[in-house]
Structure formats: structure tokens, C-alpha cells
């Protein structure tokens, strides 16, 4: 594998040499002799050469005019073999301890596309900037700006020792940190393809380091396998050093040796490092001659031989080769990615961004890239940034060397070798403690950074202080190889594109001839290149140096902001030299010895550097102000978003509440409807069950309740509909208000954005104008570029915020649409529910009507049936009466016809029975008397028996008679009850019949009334129009008559005057007078004619004016109509023509004219005659209509004039009447006064009588006038009364109609109101009938009560008779008992047997 790698490197280098066609390769024929020398020198010499020492790692940005670069390897990877080669490289690099750059993070999926076109970045590292500077230099030279440059002095400076010393300061960090950054970007490419970070704040602070997957998974294996593989590759790598020769391109082999020596110090435990930002730089000076390059090449060969003698330098050389290979891989891929990235506006770094770390490193910012990796991966990019500013110089003298060796540039090989060896020995022990200490330092710096705004210079000062204090305390910084996996980071944001370089080798680094020799010009040129990363980092690594030269370097370097990838803690190699203990005093002797020359050369740049610092601070202040504005904007955006969300949520809540309430109301209405249906069903069943029964009050009450429930339901539905309609309106208004408010807020936000953009542009232009006035144009240009990048970044942030807000707005609009849809659904549901309810109500009404009609038909049928039944009942009554009469007659006849025989028989029977009874009784009496006489001569039982026997016969007869009478009366009562029931039923049927007839009659009358009401307004309108027409005609006639009368009167007056004049002048003139009279008459006639003609002329002028106005209006309307119709007709005709000939439409598609007007072929074509005729007919009809309107208006005006004249007449008449009345009253008063005077003055009777007569006459006249007035007033009063009655009726009618219109919004309500009225009328009639029925019932009750009272009285009388009889009997019994007592007293004994017999007889 090592051999393969070496061969590959050789092939790549040869190819690179062939491709380079720059002027700097004119002396390339000097290269062949040097590879062997390099091999020999490396084999001979053990010690490290003089130019590799710790001060290479203390690189303080002293590159100046002699920055050198190393050309990178360019690998040719075919598209098909990428996977196999990448696998082989992974295995090889794992074994060799180098990192793998599979795909650069900046290039996502374009690798396969861009691989065949091999990278041109390998041709030269910083050639884009250099070529640009070269162009500027030659432009200045043409203008005569650079005439003051001394080229001999420049060449002397370039050939001096400082060039060799300074170029060595940047090699190790330049090769290590780019490797680290490459690692970082590669891992992101592998893990996050085609993705980039939107988190610009994090990207501003720092970008996390990236690593490959192989490094993530096998960090320890890499480090261990690196130990094993280095010894195997020693010889081959040292052989390769000799082949790397660049003469006039100034990418010399010196750096290869340097980098190999620098990286060979670790004991084969170096972690894989690849570049993200560009190829590793070599220390080639900008303006070296070919002689200088030869000397450098010889020195490199010497170094190679010295390294080749020992085993350890060979190992170190092999590490250099592996690192170089990894660097070249990374560079190639970076270049490939830069091709694709630079054209887009993504956040991926461009070619210039990749090149920038080289320029920054040349200023000494790289000196701190060797950082210890904390065991915690939680340290973020800010920690890395702050730690990046620490002076992590490798300590080469931890055991026995003096600090002087660590500070000054070494000139002896032995010292440097000893330094490296001692550094290697002292590494193992110092690692853990220093790592912990560095972690603490990271945290402290983080706290400081978070507490202070990130400005460039203050942070640099703080970093310098902390680094000096820490390293002045003598603490070692561990760099012993811990393989630490690089963090995944977001890719760096994109920078503005550079001006593309044209040419085949546009990216090749030229020799640097024509570079400005003064350090200030170099700084400005470098600053212009490196300031593109101004906005991405917030701190710059400053290196504390012990001399004034380095201080100035730091001051000038503060303007150069660290690129994104340089902020990360780089993975460190085991055995790399640690930093020495630095004295805090910058004026140490060792530093003074070394840096005397640069002090003199850079003495005049302090003021400019201070100006740059001030400008940097101003730019940072502007940037912080813009950031604060952006934060305010974000806050306002967030607040408005929250407000919008709150409003949307409140709307949703309101709609949910309304839906809930509507559901509740629907539920209530459904429950009411169900209850109503149940009641209606019950009523139907009751109606079906009780059809045969008479219509009672309960049914009417049920119907009334039903109607009331229906009314309440309808009212509820009506109110619900109105309320829902109002709610819907309110919701619509709320939605409109919300939309308007949101639109206003969006407009405000857009206006704020526009104002911010304008402010940014103003700031940008102001800063640009200020910086253009300053002498350092290049520096101001870089500042402006940095500000522009910051503004673009802010703009991108704002655009993203706008996009996000637009998305939020769209989401809110979607939510609003949903809410609207829900609202519409709720409306539809409500409408559906109300429609259903109305439909059900209509169905119920129809069923109710049907039932009512059915019941009415039944009632009608019952009424008709009742008539038949009444007739039948009357016939039956007549028949019964006749039968009873006949029966009575028959009984009478029977009694009359069969009386003698029956009477004789009855008498004979009765006689026989009476005889037997008499015999039995007599016998019994005799027996009893005998017994009584025997036993008890005065005993009562016999007497009692005799009395009871006589009483029984009498009682039986009476009882039978009474029973018969009662039965007869009961039968009569039953008959009367039946008759009453029948009569009631007949009355009910007659009532129903009358009711039906009455309702029919009412309906007919209502229909007639409605018909008449419909006809009445028409007739009224006709009559009113006729009246108006007649009134207008009458007014016209009156006016004409009055005008003629006036004219005639005027003429008569004129003639009278003329007559008078003539009579006066008759005597004087005679014939002349006659002529003058004729002449005057003619003159009068002419004047009258003139006046008449003037009047006619004025009238005609008015008519002409009216007609001109109407004509103008019609013309305007015609123009409007034509302007509307012509485009339509043209479009129609064009459409018809296109339909007929579709190819013509395509063929006429000519470009627009210069004025931008389209050619319309139908614009000036004549319209069809039919269209013209139609237009003419339409205009005529419009003119006729207008004439009619004018005539109507004339009529109305004439009517108004007539009314005015009438009113004037009335006023005049009233005034005349009033004056007459006043005159009459005045005369009366005068007469009264005269009468009083006469009465007072005269004393005779005649005068008194005359006065009385006069007064009586006056009174009579007065009374007559009053009577006449009263008669006139009576007539007018009668007319006014009639009018008032008519008007009152009309007003009442209109009020009723208005009331009906107000109450009855819908025809259903009107119908229900009619039903309600009918029901009220029915109720009134029902009450009246009930009252009549109650009267009838009361009458019948009175009759029955009277009869009952009669019966009761009769029975009372009977009872009284019985009581009297009983009293008589008692008295008789008392007398008998007295007789018996007397007998008993006398001693007469009544026998007991007789008593027993009497008892048996009783039983």
C-alpha cells in the first residue's frame, strides 16, 4: 500500500507539473537533480534541521511578504472505481494512522459528477487571491500608482534571512488545522448529505468539528494502527521528499521537509487530519528569485539526508507523507465541491472560504490550533472558539532546555533535535493534568464571552491576557495523541461569490511578482481575502508575543476574523511539541534579539491598525444594533403570532359553545315535538273514540291547548330562527374584522421589514461611502464585504422568518377556513333542523285540516241524519199519540159497550162474596162476643181484630191506587226524560248544522271581501287617475279661460283708456282722432300678439331646453351602450371567425406595436344594418318612454299648479269672508253704540220702540247670517264627516293590515292567525250555545222540580191524612180500652181462648 501511495503521489506530482503553465515555471529544468540529494541528506543526518523548532509552532502571523504554500496532491478517481478505491484507502489510512476524506461535506451528491473533471485547486492554493492582487497591482502600475516601489529593495527583503525564518512559522499549524477541518466536513458529508443548517446563530458562533465515520467508529484503532504502519513506510516516504520540487512556482520542497519534520515528532500516534478549508500551505515567499529557491532546495535536501540517517526521522517523514496524502485528498475534494457550491445561494462554503484559513494562518492565527481535546464532548463551538485563542504552543523544553530555545528562532540543528526528543519524552506525563486545566479554561472563557457582547478587539485582548497568564504560570499544554472523534457540525454558511478567474490555470498560485513590498499593502491585500469570514466568527486568535513586531502583527490580525472551521478544537498528535513557559514581559531579551528588523519595517502601521480596529468596533456596533432590531422584530412576530393563535382559539371556543347551545335547543325542541306528537295522537284517538258522543267542553279545551302549544312552538321556532340569523351575522362581522386585523398586521410587518431593509441598505451605503474616503481602500472594501455578508445573513434570516410567518399565516387561514366550514355546517344543520320542523309543522297542519274537514263532514252528515231522525221521531210521536187516543177510545167503548153484563156479573160476584164475608164475619163476631163475654166481658182483642179487618181493606185499595199512580208518573217522567234528551240532541244537531252553515257563509264572505279588496285599489287607482286627469284638464281649461279673461280685460282697459283719450281729443282732432284710434287699436292688438308670441316663444324655448337635455342624456346612454356592446359584438364576431377559421387566429399573433396597443381589425369596421336598426328601435322606444315620462311630469306639475291655485283661491275666499265678518261685526258694534246713544239721549216711547225694533231687526239679521253660516257649515260638516268616516275606516283598515303584516311575517303565520280568529269566534259561539243550553236545562229542571214539588206535596197530604186516620184510630182504641178497663173494674172477665184465637187470626 505504501508503495502504491508513493507511486500515486509521484504520478500526481508529474501531472501537476505538466498542467502548470504559469510564468513562474520558466526555470523548472533545475528540478531533476534534487531528489537523490534529498534522499542522501535525509539518510546522513540524524538531528533535526535548524529550520524546524518550536517557533514554527509559535507562528504569530509574521508571514509578510514571504508566505509559502505547498501544492496538493491531485487524485484521479474514475467514476466507476470510487467505491473500491475508497475502501482500499480506508484500509490503508487506518493502518497508517491518517484520516480518510471520503466525500467533502461541502459537496453532497455531486461527487460522481465532479470527479471526472479533476480539481484545479491542486494547481495552486491561494492563486485566486494572488491573481486578483496581481491584476490590481498591474492596474495600479498602469495608472502610475506604484512608481515608488523599489524592486531591488523588495528582492533583497525577499532573499533575506527573515523570509526563511518567517515562512517556517506557519507550516505545522497550517498542515494540522486544515486537516482537522477537513475531517469535520467529511463526517458531515457522510452523515448529512444534501443538508445544511438553518441555525445561523450557531453557525455564527462556531461550526462544530466534523469527522469521518471511520474516525468515529475507530478512533483508537487509527492511533494504534498508525504506530504499526509508520516504520514500514519510512524509506519510501523519505524517497518521495526528494521528488517534490517547485522552483519558480515557489511551492518548494522546503515545506515538505518542514512539514515532515514538524509532523514527525509524534511517535507514530498522530490522528487522522484532513483539511476542510484548503490545501496545506508551504513557506514559499511571495517574491523569491530562482537563486533563492535553489538555496532553499539545497537546504531541504540537506534536511532530508539528516533525517534519513536515523530511524525516528524516517518515521517522521512517513507521517509527513501520510498527512500530505490525506491533505491532498481533502483539498481535491474541497475544490470539487467548490465548483458546485459557488454558484448557489446555499450555506456551503465557497472556494474563497476554503482558501481563507491559509491567509489567516499566514498572519499567525494558526499558532493556537494545536489544542488538547477535552474528554467531554459537550464543549460547544464557543468553547472551541475561546480555546482556539489560547497560545497552545508546543513545549519543546519541558525537561532540560532553556525557555530561550523555545522562544527564539533556532539556527542550530542539534538544539532543535534535542528539543524535539525532550518534548517527546516529556509528553506522556503532562497530558491528563493539562487537559483538566484546559477544560476549566474553556468554561471561564465561555462565561466571559456570554457576559460581554462579541466584539473583535476586546475578545482578542482577553484571550491574550488569559493565554499569557496561563502559559506564564508554566503550565504545559498537552498535545499527546488522543484520538478524539470530531464533532458533527453544521456546515458553514455560504459567503458571497468571488470574481471568477478565467484561464486554464486560474486556480494555480503564481510566483507573487508584483506584490506590494510594504507590509501595509500586504496586510490590506490579505485582509481583503480573509475578511470574507468576518460575520461567521466572533473572536480572533491573537498570539501573545514578546516583541513589538508581534504585537503589531496581532493588532493587524484582529481585523481578520477566523473562518468557520478554525474555531474547533483540533485533534492533536502524540508527541507534538508542547508550548514553552512564556514570560509575561513582552520585552524579553530573547524576543528583542530576534525581532529587531521587523520592528523597523512595521513601525509606521500602528495608526492605520488603530483606525482599522475602530472601524471594526463601529461595524460590530452596527451589527449588534441590527441584531437588536432583528430580535425586536422576532419578539413582535412572536407576539402577533400568539395573538392570532389566541383569536383563533377564542373563535373556536365560541363556535363550540354555540354548537353546544344549538344542540341543546334542538334537543329541547325535539322533546317538545315528541310531546306534541303524543298529545296529537291522544287527541286523535279521543276524537276517533268519541265521534258518536256530543262535542263537550273537554274536547274544546283539548283543541285549545293543542292550538296554544302549536302557537308557542311556532313562536319559539320564529325566535330561534331570528336569533340564529343574528348570530350568523355577528360571526360574519367578527370574521371580517379578524381578517381585516390580520391583513393590517401583515401590512405593518411588511412595512417594518421594508424599513429595516432600507436602514440596512443606508447603513451599508454610508459605511461604504465613509470607507471610500479613507486611504486604505482595500481594508474598507473588506469591511464592506463583511457588513454586506452580515446584512445578507440578516436578510436570509428575515426571509426565513417571512417564510415561516407566511406558513403560519397559511395555517391560520386554513384554520379560519375550517372554522368557516364548521360555521357553514352548523348553519346548514340549523337550516335543515328548522326546515324539518317547519315541514313537520306543515304536515301536522295539513293533517289537522284534514281531520277538521273530516269532522265537519261528519257533523254535516249527523246534522242531515238528525233531520231525518227528527222527522221520524215526530212521526213516531204522532203515531203513539194516535194509538193512545185510539186505545183510550177503545177502552171507553169497551166500558160503554160491555157494561150491563159485566156489571151484573161483577155485582153478583161481589154480592156473593159480600154475603159470604158478612156471614163469616157475623159468625166470627158472634163467636168472639160469646168468648169475650165468657172470659173477658170487656176485652180489647175482639175490638182490635174488628178494627184491623176494616182498616186492611181500606189500606189495600189506597196502596194499589197509589202504586198505580206512581208507576204512571214514573212512566210519564221517563217519557219526558227521553223527550228532553231527544230535544237536546236535536238542538245540538241543529247547532252543528247552523255552525257549519255559518262557517261556510263566513268563508264565502271572506273570499268576497278579499276579492273586493283586491279590486278596490285597482278601481281606486283607476278612479284616482281619472280624477287626476280630469282635474288637470279642468285646471288647464281654467288657466286658459283665466288667461283669455285677463287678456280681454287688459284689452278692455286699454280700449277704455283709448276711448277716454279719444273723447277728450274728439273736439280737437276729428278725422285724425279716428285714425289715431285705429292706429292705437292696431298697436294694442300688435302688443297683445307680441306678448302672446313672447310667451309662446318662452314656452318653446323651455321645451327645446328640455328636449336638448333629454337628447344629450340619450346620446350619453347610447354611447355607453355602444361602448359596452361593441366589444361584445367584436368578441362574438372574432369568436365566430376563429371558429370558422382557427388557423387565422394563430397566424395573427404578431408582436405588439411600439405604443403597446394591440391591433384590432374590427375596431373601425361598420356594424351590421340589423344591429343599427335594433339600436334605432331601442332608442325610439326609449325616446317614447322619455316623452311619456315628460308628459307625466307635465301633468303632475299642472296638477300641482292647480292645487296651488285652488289653495290660493281658498285663502282669498277665507280672507274675504274674514274681512266681511269683521265688517259685519264692526257695523253691529256701531249700531249697538248708536242704539245705546239713542236710548240714553231719547226719552219718548216711540223712540224707544223704534230702537227696540231696530235692535230686533239687527238681531234678526245677525241670526239670519248665523243661520246661513251654520247651514253652510253644516253642509261642509256633513261632507267632512263623511270624509272623516271614510278616512277613519281606511286608517283602521290600514292599521289592521299593518298589524297583520307585523304579526304575520309568513303565510303560515297568517293562516294560523286566521285559524285563531275562527277559533275565537267558535269559542264565542260555543259559549253562547252553552248559555242557551244551560238556560234550557235550567228551565227543564225548574219544570221537573215543580212537578216533583207537586208530587211531594201530594204525598205529604196523603201522609197527613193517614196520620189523621191513625190519630182517630188511636182515640177509638183509647175509648175501647177505657170501656175494657171499666168492664174489668166491674168484674167482667174476658176469656183467654178468645184472645188466643184472636192472636192466630192476627197471624
UniProtKB/Swiss-Prot annotation:
Biased composition (Basic residues): 485-500
Residue numbers bearing the Phosphoserine modification: 160, 163
One of the GO BP terms on file: cilium assembly
Keyword Glycoprotein carried by entry: no
Region (Disordered): 20-46, 169-243, 256-292, 306-348, 453-606, 1126-1147
Cell location: Cytoplasm, Cytoskeleton, Microtubule organizing center, Centrosome, Centriole; Cytoplasm, Cytoskeleton, Spindle; Nucleus
Main location as per UniProt: cytoplasm
GO cellular component entries: axonemal microtubule; centriolar satellite; centriole; ciliary basal body; cytosol; Golgi apparatus; nucleoplasm; spindle
Compositionally skewed regions (Basic and acidic residues) per UniProt: 35-46, 210-238, 526-536, 571-585, 1128-1144
Coiled-coil residues: 614-1124, 1174-1386
Assembly and interaction partners: Interacts with CPNE4. Interacts with alpha-tubulin. Interacts with CEP290.
Protein name: Centrosomal protein of 162 kDa
Organism: Mus musculus (Mouse)
High-level lineage: Eukaryota, Metazoa, Chordata, Craniata, Vertebrata
Amino acid at each position: 500500500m505504501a508503495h502504491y501511495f508513493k507511486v500515486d503521489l509521484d504520478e500526481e506530482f508529474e501531472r501537476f507539473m505538466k498542467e502548470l503553465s504559469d510564468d513562474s515555471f520558466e526555470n523548472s529544468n533545475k528540478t531533476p537533480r534534487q531528489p537523490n540529494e534529498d534522499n542522501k541528506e535525509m539518510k546522513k543526518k540524524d538531528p533535526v534541521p535548524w529550520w524546524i523548532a518550536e517557533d514554527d509552532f509559535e507562528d504569530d502571523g509574521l508571514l509578510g511578504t514571504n508566505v509559502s504554500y505547498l501544492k496538493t496532491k491531485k487524485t484521479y478517481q474514475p467514476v466507476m472505481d470510487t467505491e473500491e478505491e475508497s475502501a482500499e484507502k480506508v484500509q490503508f489510512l487506518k493502518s497508517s494512522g491518517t484520516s480518510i476524506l471520503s466525500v467533502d461535506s461541502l459537496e453532497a451528491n455531486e461527487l460522481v459528477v465532479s470527479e471526472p473533471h479533476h480539481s484545479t485547486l491542486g494547481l495552486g492554493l491561494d492563486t485566486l487571491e494572488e491573481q486578483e492582487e496581481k491584476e490590481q497591482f498591474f492596474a495600479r502600475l498602469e495608472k502610475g500608482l506604484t512608481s515608488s516601489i523599489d524592486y531591488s529593495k523588495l528582492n533583497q527583503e525577499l532573499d533575506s534571512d527573515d523570509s526563511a525564518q518567517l515562512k517556517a512559522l506557519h507550516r505545522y499549524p497550517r498542515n494540522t488545522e486544515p486537516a482537522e477541518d477537513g475531517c469535520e466536513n467529511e463526517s458531515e458529508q457522510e452523515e448529512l448529505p444534501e443538508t445544511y443548517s438553518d441555525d445561523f446563530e450557531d453557525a455564527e458562533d462556531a461550526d462544530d468539528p466534523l469527522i469521518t465515520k471511520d474516525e468515529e467508529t475507530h478512533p483508537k484503532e487509527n492511533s494504534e494502527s498508525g504506530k504499526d504502519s509508520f516504520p514500514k513506510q519510512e524509506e519510501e516516504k523519505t524517497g518521495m521528499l526528494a521528488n517534490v520540487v517547485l522552483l519558480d512556482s515557489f511551492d518548494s520542497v522546503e515545506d515538505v521537509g518542514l512539514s515532515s519534520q514538524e509532523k514527525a515528532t509524534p511517535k507514530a500516534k498522530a490522528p487522522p487530519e484532513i483539511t476542510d478549508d484548503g490545501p496545506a500551505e508551504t513557506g514559499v515567499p511571495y517574491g523569491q528569485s530562482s537563486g533563492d529557491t535553489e538555496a532553499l532546495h539545497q537546504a531541504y535536501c540537506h534536511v532530508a539526508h539528516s533525517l534519513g540517517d536515523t530511524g525516528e526521522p524516517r518515521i517522521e517523514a512517513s507521517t509527513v507523507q501520510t498527512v500530505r496524502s490525506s491533505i491532498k485528498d481533502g483539498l481535491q475534494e474541497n475544490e470539487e465541491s467548490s465548483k458546485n457550491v459557488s454558484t448557489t445561494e446555499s450555506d456551503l462554503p465557497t472556494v474563497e472560504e476554503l482558501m481563507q484559513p491559509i491567509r489567516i494562518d499566514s498572519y499567525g492565527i494558526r499558532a493556537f490550533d494545536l489544542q488538547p481535546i477535552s474528554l467531554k464532548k459537550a464543549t460547544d463551538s464557543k468553547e472551541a472558539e475561546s480555546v482556539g485563542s489560547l497560545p497552545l504552543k508546543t513545549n519543546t523544553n519541558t525537561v532540560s532546555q532553556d525557555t530561550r530555545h523555545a522562544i527564539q528562532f533556532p539556527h542550530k540543528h542539534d538544539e532543535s533535535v534535542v528539543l524535539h526528543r525532550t518534548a517527546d519524552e516529556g509528553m506522556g506525563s503532562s497530558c491528563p493534568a493539562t487537559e483538566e486545566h484546559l477544560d476549566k479554561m474553556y468554561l471561564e472563557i465561555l462565561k466571559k464571552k456570554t457576559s460581554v457582547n462579541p466584539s473583535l478587539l476586546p475578545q482578542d485582548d482577553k484571550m491574550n491576557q488569559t493565554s499569557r497568564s496561563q502559559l506564564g504560570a508554566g503550565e504545559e499544554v498537552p498535545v499527546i495523541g488522543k484520538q478524539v472523534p470530531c464533532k458533527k457540525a453544521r456546515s458553514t454558511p455560504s459567503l458571497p461569490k468571488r470574481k471568477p478567474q478565467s484561464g486554464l490555470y486560474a486556480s494555480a498560485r503564481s510566483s507573487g511578482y508584483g506584490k506590494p513590498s510594504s507590509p501595509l499593502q500586504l496586510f490590506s491585500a490579505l485582509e481583503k481575502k480573509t475578511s470574507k469570514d468576518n460575520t461567521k466568527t466572533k473572536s480572533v486568535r491573537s498570539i501573545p508575543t514578546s516583541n513589538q513586531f508581534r504585537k503589531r502583527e496581532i493588532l493587524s490580525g484582529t481585523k481578520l476574523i477566523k473562518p468557520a472551521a478554525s474555531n474547533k478544537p483540533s485533534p492533536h498528535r502524540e508527541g507534538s511539541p508542547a508550548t514553552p513557559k512564556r514570560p509575561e514581559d513582552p520585552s524579553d531579551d530573547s524576543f528583542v534579539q530576534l525581532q529587531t528588523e521587523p520592528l523597523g519595517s512595521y513601525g509606521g502601521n500602528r495608526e492605520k491598525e488603530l483606525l482599522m480596529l475602530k472601524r471594526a468596533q463601529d461595524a460590530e456596533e452596527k451589527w449588534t444594533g441590527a441584531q437588536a432590531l432583528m430580535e425586536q422584530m422576532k419578539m413582535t412576530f412572536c407576539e402577533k403570532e400568539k395573538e392570532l393563535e389566541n383569536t383563533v382559539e377564542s373563535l373556536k371556543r365560541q363556535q363550540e359553545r354555540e354548537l353546544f347551545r344549538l344542540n341543546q335547543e334542538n334537543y329541547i325542541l325535539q322533546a317538545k315535538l315528541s310531546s306534541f306528537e303524543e298529545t296529537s295522537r291522544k287527541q286523535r284517538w279521543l276524537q276517533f273514540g268519541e265521534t258518536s258522543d256530543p262535542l263537550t267542553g273537554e274536547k274544546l279545551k283539548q283543541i285549545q291547548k293543542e292550538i296554544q302549544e302549536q302557537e308557542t312552538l311556532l313562536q319559539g321556532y320564529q325566535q330561534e330562527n331570528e336569533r340564529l340569523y343574528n348570530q350568523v351575522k355577528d360571526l360574519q362581522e367578527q370574521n371580517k374584522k379578524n381578517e381585516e386585523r390580520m391583513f393590517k398586521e401583515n401590512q405593518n410587518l411588511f412595512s417594518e421589514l421594508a424599513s429595516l431593509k432600507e436602514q440596512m441598505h443606508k447603513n451599508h451605503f454610508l459605511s461604504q461611502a465613509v470607507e471610500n474616503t479613507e486611504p486604505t481602500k482595500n481594508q474598507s472594501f473588506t469591511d464592506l464585504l463583511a457588513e454586506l455578508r452580515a446584512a445578507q445573513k440578516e436578510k436570509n434570516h428575515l426571509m426565513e422568518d417571512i417564510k415561516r410567518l407566511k406558513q403560519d399565516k397559511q395555517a391560520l387561514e386554513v384554520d379560519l377556513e375550517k372554522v368557516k366550514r364548521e360555521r357553514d355546517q352548523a348553519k346548514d344543520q340549523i337550516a335543515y333542523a328548522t326546515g324539518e320542523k317547519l315541514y313537520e309543522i306543515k304536515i301536522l297542519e295539513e293533517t289537522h285540516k284534514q281531520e277538521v274537514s273530516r269532522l265537519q263532514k261528519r257533523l254535516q252528515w249527523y246534522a242531515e241524519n238528525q233531520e231525518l231522525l227528527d222527522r221520524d221521531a215526530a212521526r213516531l210521536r204522532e203515531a203513539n199519540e194516535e194509538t193512545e187516543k185510539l186505545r183510550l177510545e177503545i177502552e171507553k167503548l169497551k166500558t160503554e159497550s160491555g157494561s150491563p153484563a159485566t156489571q151484573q156479573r161483577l155485582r153478583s160476584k161481589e154480592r156473593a162474596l159480600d154475603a159470604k164475608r158478612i156471614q163469616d164475619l157475623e159468625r166470627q163476631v158472634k163467636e168472639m162476643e160469646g168468648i169475650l163475654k165468657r172470659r173477658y166481658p170487656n176485652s180489647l182483642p175482639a175490638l182490635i181484630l174488628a178494627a184491623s179487618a176494616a182498616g186492611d181493606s181500606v189500606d189495600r185499595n189506597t196502596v194499589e191506587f197509589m202504586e198505580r199512580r206512581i208507576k204512571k208518573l214514573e212512566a210519564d217522567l221517563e217519557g219526558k226524560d227521553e223527550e228532553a234528551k231527544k230535544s237536546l240532541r236535536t238542538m245540538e244537531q241543529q247547532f252543528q248544522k247552523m255552525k257549519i252553515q255559518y262557517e261556510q257563509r263566513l268563508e264565502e264572505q271572506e273570499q268576497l271581501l278579499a276579492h273586493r279588496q283586491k279590486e278596490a285599489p285597482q278601481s281606486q287607482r283607476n278612479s284616482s287617475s281619472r280624477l287626476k286627469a280630469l282635474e288637470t284638464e279642468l285646471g288647464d281649461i281654467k288657466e286658459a279661460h283665466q288667461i283669455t279673461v285677463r287678456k280681454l280685460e287688459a284689452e278692455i282697459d286699454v280700449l277704455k283708456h283709448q276711448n277716454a283719450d279719444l273723447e277728450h281729443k274728439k273736439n280737437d282732432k276729428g278725422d285724425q282722432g279716428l285714425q289715431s284710434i285705429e292706429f292705437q287699436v292696431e298697436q294694442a292688438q300688435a302688443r297683445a300678439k307680441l306678448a302672446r308670441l313672447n310667451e309662446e316663444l318662452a314656452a318653446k324655448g323651455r321645451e327645446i331646453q328640455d328636449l336638448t337635455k333629454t337628447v344629450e342624456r340619450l346620446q350619453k346612454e347610447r354611447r355607453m351602450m355602444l361602448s359596452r356592446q361593441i366589444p361584445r359584438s367584436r368578441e362574438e364576431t372574432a369568436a365566430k371567425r376563429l371558429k370558422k377559421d382557427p388557423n387565422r387566429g394563430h397566424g395573427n399573433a404578431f408582436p405588439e406595436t411600439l405604443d403597446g396597443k394591440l391591433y384590432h381589425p374590427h375596431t373601425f369596421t361598420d356594424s351590421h344594418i340589423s344591429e343599427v336598426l335594433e339600436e334605432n328601435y331601442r332608442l325610439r322606444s326609449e325616446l317614447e318612454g322619455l316623452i311619456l315620462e315628460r308628459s307625466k311630469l307635465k301633468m303632475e306639475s299642472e296638477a300641482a299648479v292647480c292645487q296651488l291655485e285652488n289653495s290660493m283661491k281658498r285663502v282669498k275666499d277665507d280672507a274675504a269672508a274674514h274681512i266681511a265678518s269683521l265688517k259685519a261685526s264692526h257695523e253691529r258694534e256701531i249700531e249697538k253704540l248708536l242704539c245705546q246713544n239713542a236710548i240714553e239721549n231719547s226719552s219718548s216711547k216711540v223712540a224707544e220702540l223704534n230702537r227696540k225694533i231696530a235692535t230686533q231687526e239687527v238681531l234678526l239679521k245677525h241670526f239670519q247670517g248665523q243661520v246661513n253660516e251654520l247651514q253652510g257649515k253644516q253642509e261642509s260638516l256633513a261632507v267632512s264627516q263623511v270624509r272623516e268616516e271614510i278616512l277613519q275606516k281606511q286608517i283602521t283598515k290600514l292599521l289592521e293590515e299593518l298589524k297583520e303584516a307585523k304579526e304575520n311575517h309568513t303565510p303560515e303565520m297568517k293562516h294560523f292567525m286566521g285559524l285563531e280568529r275562527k277559533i275565537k269566534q267558535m269559542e264565542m259561539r260555543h259559549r253562547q250555545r252553552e248559555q242557551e243550553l244551560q238556560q234550557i236545562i235550567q228551565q227543564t229542571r225548574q219544570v221537573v222540580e215543580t212537578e216533583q214539588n207537586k208530587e211531594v206535596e201530594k204525598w205529604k197530604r196523603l201522609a197527613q191524612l193517614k196520620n189523621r186516620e191513625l190519630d182517630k184510630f188511636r182515640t177509638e182504641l183509647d175509648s175501647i180500652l177505657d170501656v175494657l178497663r171499666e168492664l174489668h173494674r166491674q168484674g167482667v172477665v174476658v176469656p183467654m181462648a178468645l184472645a188466643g184465637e184472636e192472636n192466630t187470626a192476627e197471624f
